[in-house]
């Protein structure tokens, strides 16, 4: 069974046991996180109806905070000697998916 969840403006296809990096979330390592924005669930059949997805819960455990790849920014203006170099590394929260509950009895 897998689910498609939205976090940080991105969509992630997750299954139980998957480790996924999402935009930075608050929470200490070992804390439980609920991912409420479920867009699709695939079990015995694919579910994408909004009413049925309202009862679906995807739970995950915070593994830690990791940094993404270094991005180098270089601004340059011709004939003036202007150079500006800057770098950036985005922080991500690493999650391990612990459960997908469909809410069916």
UniProtKB/Swiss-Prot annotation:
GO terms for cellular component: cytoplasm; ribonucleoprotein complex; ribosome. Keywords: Ribonucleoprotein, Ribosomal protein, RNA-binding, rRNA-binding. GO terms for molecular function: rRNA binding; structural constituent of ribosome. GO terms for biological process: translation. PANTHER family: 50S RIBOSOMAL PROTEIN L21, LARGE RIBOSOMAL SUBUNIT PROTEIN BL21M. This protein binds to 23S rRNA in the presence of protein L20. NCBIfam families: L21 (TIGR00061). Part of the 50S ribosomal subunit. Contacts protein L20. Belongs to the bacterial ribosomal protein bL21 family. This is Large ribosomal subunit protein bL21. It comes from Parafrankia sp. (strain EAN1pec). The gene is rplU.
